[in-house]
């Protein structure tokens, strides 16, 4: 019996990898323009990092983490998200002491959560995220929002909606927390077990419950906006004014609550509207997390960031029929006829590749017709035909596969000739 792929994972095959590389390159190029530098962190961390950084009352920590003990008895966890690891690296490597501040970082890599696999949710998934650490300026909130919206726009996605909210500062959240407890407590027995546990630990998370979202108390729950301090209101208004100045449309939703404990002030999601995308509409989430760095042992440091799923971006592209067509073409295919020509073909392909030209040859002893079909399947721009007769006179036949035009070229000149064709785009 063949061994099957683990549930909740996927093989990304060569034809699909090109789309992934295209999306990832968009992220790299955009982050370079915004002056964000790539950081690469371990795929597993000490479990304590996520207990403190993500929050021990969150679904991620309570239900979804892949946690194990190593042979030394240490509790380790495959990273379920990127922000905690990046902030840990920020503290461990004392990036807060560098001259260039704020520290602006981005990452692309796999995350792991034990979830029920469904459309848009995998147990191993790839996130692109950015983190800006060291600035409490509303302008950098706007920058992060501008970056993620531009990312989706450059992918070609339409019908995007940016939803924002303010979760306030510490005083605002404490006042709102008390109001939520008073609101839900008399009838908390009508809610799910998770919500009952959250009442005292983190009542804000009740508003994020999927099971009880239609309960009548949800619609009448106290709004955080009624408890925002003067400073929090001013901060949120400034973020909105920047977005307006940048011509970035947004919607304020006072019920927006992110599923992680570390968020405060600005919280946001990017959603996509339109048919064909199923029940999954949220593409990206993020927000400000002042206090997270201190929670994991660093100095007082404000921060803001987002994370998005590459898989969901691809789903959205497919739903909108905006997924780009990729036909990876090679520059030339070397066709050989006869043993001596075959041996020489090995040398020619090696020389062409070393000169920066993508080249391929036959390894299945196919006849000329089969080799030409292989060249066509690989979208070869040129074929280089070498038989016993050509070898005897020291020449090859170079054929432009688009125009059909053929030219005889000396073997000793082949590499320079092909470089001229490839780099100059000339037809041969």
UniProtKB/Swiss-Prot annotation:
GO terms for molecular function: ATP binding; catalytic activity, acting on a protein; histidine-tRNA ligase activity; transferase activity. It is found in: Cytoplasm. Its EC number is 6.1.1.21. Gene3D superfamilies: Anticodon-binding domain (3.40.50.800), Bira Bifunctional Protein, Domain 2 (3.30.930.10). PROSITE patterns: AA_TRNA_LIGASE_II. Pfam families: HGTP_anticodon, tRNA-synt_His. Keywords: Aminoacyl-tRNA synthetase, ATP-binding, Cytoplasm, Ligase, Nucleotide-binding, Protein biosynthesis. It catalyses: tRNA(His) + L-histidine + ATP = L-histidyl-tRNA(His) + AMP + diphosphate + H(+). One of its GO terms (cellular component) is cytoplasm. It is an enzyme of class 6 (ligase). CDD domains: HisRS-like_core, HisRS_anticodon. Signal peptide: none annotated. GO terms for biological process: histidyl-tRNA aminoacylation. Belongs to the class-II aminoacyl-tRNA synthetase family. Homodimer. NCBIfam families: hisS. This is Histidine--tRNA ligase.
């Amino acid at each position: 019996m063949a061994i099957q792929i683990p549930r909740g994972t996927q093989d990304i095959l060569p034809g699909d990898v090109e789309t992934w590389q295209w999306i990832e390159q968009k992220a790299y190029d955009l982050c370079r323009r915004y002056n964000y530098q790539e950081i690469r962190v371990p795929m597993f961390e000490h479990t304590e990092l996520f207990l403190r950084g993500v929050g021990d009352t969150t679904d991620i920590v309570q239900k979804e983490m892949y946690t194990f003990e190593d042979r030394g008895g240490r509790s380790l966890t495959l990273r379920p998200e990127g922000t905690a690891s990046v902030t840990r690296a920020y503290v461990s490597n004392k990036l807060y002491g560098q001259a260039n501040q704020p520290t602006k970082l981005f990452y692309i890599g796999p995350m792991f959560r034990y979830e029920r696999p469904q459309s848009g949710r995998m147990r191993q998934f790839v996130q692109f995220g950015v983190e800006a650490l060291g600035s409490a300026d509303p302008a950098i909130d706007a920058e992060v929002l501008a970056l993620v919206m531009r990312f989706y726009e450059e992918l070609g996605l339409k019908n995007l909606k940016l939803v924002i909210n303010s979760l306030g500062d510490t005083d605002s959240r404490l006042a709102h927390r008390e109001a939520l407890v008073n609101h839900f407590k008399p009838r908390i027995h009508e809610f799910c077990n998770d919500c009952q546990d959250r009442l005292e630990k983190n009542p804000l998370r009740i508003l994020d419950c999927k099971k009880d979202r239609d309960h009548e108390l949800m619609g009448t729950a106290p709004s955080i906006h009624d408890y925002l301090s003067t400073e929090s209101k001013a901060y949120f208004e400034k973020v909105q004014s920047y977005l307006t100045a940048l011509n970035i449309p947004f919607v304020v939703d006072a019920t927006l609550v992110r599923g992680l404990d570390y968020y405060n002030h600005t919280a946001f999601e990017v959603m996509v509207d339109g048919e064909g995308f199923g029940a999954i509409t949220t593409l990206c989430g993020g927000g400000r997390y002042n206090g997270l760095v201190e929670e994991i042992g660093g100095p007082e440091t404000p921060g803001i960031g987002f994370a998005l799923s590459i898989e969901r971006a691809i789903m959205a592209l497919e739903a909108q029929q905006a997924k780009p067509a990729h036909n990876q073409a090679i520059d030339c295919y070397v066709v050989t006829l006869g043993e001596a020509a075959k041996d020489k073909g090995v040398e020619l392909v090696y020389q062409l590749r070393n000169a920066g030209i993508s080249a391929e040859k036959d390894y299945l002893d196919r006849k000329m017709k089969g080799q030409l079909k292989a060249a066509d399947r690989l979208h070869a721009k040129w074929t280089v035909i070498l038989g016993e007769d050509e070898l005897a006179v020291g020449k090859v036949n170079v054929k432009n596969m688009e125009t059909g035009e053929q030219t005889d070229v000396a073997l000793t000149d082949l590499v320079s000739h092909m470089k001229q064709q490839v780099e100059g785009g000339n037809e041969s």
